[in-house]
Regions:
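Residues forming the flavin
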Residues: 1-22, 49-237
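Conserved catalytic/binding loops enriched for acidic/polar residues
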Residues: 23, 27-42
Length: 237
């Protein structure tokens, strides 16, 4: 859950990533436990973290859709920044270094060296322009896709394609979905069309406190719903 996301954690290997592909389902579930426990640990009000765990598909949807039966934890968008601050301070106190206002410009895989350049030299906290590593995790968001592609092409790094999911977001009054919400706060409906080789699923339902944030990437606009916990944000959407 990013700092501007819907503040929910899906507890299953079938949605949200390929972790089990690399470490197996059992280890993936163990790591998910660690993530959820840390979100509670650094939450200013951990007692408000809500778990929705449907145990059976309701009869009224069976002719049309299936329902994923696994837990979803609602942390709350309005708490994510404070959780991030607490988590950050814990890492700093443990000796982890963060380098701000700096940008990775290259990686030398022969010398195990990450090359930096300062974006705003007056604010950077780096003493050197490179860092040596024993092991490197290269994790970038959408804004780093081009840089990742440049590195892969420059050093002939092996890559593999990832499936693409296309989503459409719409807002509707909560009353139209209340029967489903009573079964599962963040209900996950799905339907497979085997003859077409495609499937549909619902995701990111932000019930009774839905706010939409716009994100601009490469000239396109995408939207991400917020699911806030504080009752004062409730808007019946």
């Amino acid at each position: 859950a990013g700092g501007w996301s819907d503040g929910k954690l899906t507890y299953h290997t079938s949605i949200g990533g390929q972790l089990s592909k690399y470490c197996g389902d059992e280890k993936a579930m163990e790591l998910m436990d660690q993530v959820i426990n840390n979100f509670k640990r650094f939450h200013p009000k951990p007692e408000e973290v809500q778990c929705s765990n449907p145990v059976a598909e309701p009869d009224f949807i069976k002719p049309y859709f299936g329902l994923r039966l696994f837990p979803v934890w609602h942390v709350g968008t309005d708490y994510l920044h404070e959780i991030g601050k607490n988590w950050y301070q814990y890492l700093v106190d443990g000796g982890v270094n963060f380098y701000w206002e700096s940008k990775v410009s290259d990686i030398n895989f022969k010398t195990n060296e990450v090359i930096f350049k300062s974006v705003k030299p007056e604010f950077t906290n780096m003493d050197n322009d490179s860092i040596f590593y024993d092991n490197l995790i290269f994790g970038v968001g959408k804004s780093g896709i081009d840089f990742g592609k440049q590195l892969a092409e420059k050093y002939n790094l092996p890559t593999e394609p990832k499936s693409v999911q296309i989503g459409v977001r719409f807002e509707a009054p909560q009353k139209h979905f209340q029967k489903l919400i009573d079964v599962s706060y963040d209900f996950k409906l799905y339907r497979k069309y085997d003859d077409e080789g495609v499937s549909l699923r619902s995701f990111c339902t932000n019930n009774n406190a839905a706010y939409v944030a716009a994100e601009h990437t490469y000239g396109d606009i995408s939207y991400n719903g917020h699911a806030k916990k504080d009752p004062s944000y409730r808007n019946d959407m």
